[in-house]
Amino acid sequence: MADDFAKGYSCAVATLIRLDNGVSTNARELFRAGGWSIDELKKVGIDVTDLDILKKYREELEK
C-alpha cells in the first residue's frame, strides 16, 4: 500500500513539474513533503516517465 501511495505521489509531483514547465516552488514543496528521496522512489518502482522527470530536475527538487 505504501508503495502504491509513493507511486501516485511521485506521479503528482512529475505532473506538476510538466504543467509548470519546470520546478516551481509548489512542486519543490510537494516533493519535499513526501519525505522520499529520488533514489528511494526508484527502489519503490515508480513509473519510468515520472522517474526521468524527477531525475532531470533532481538538483532543483533537492535544494
Task: Describe each PLM feature range.
Residues 1-63:
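Intrinsic-disorder/low-complexity detector
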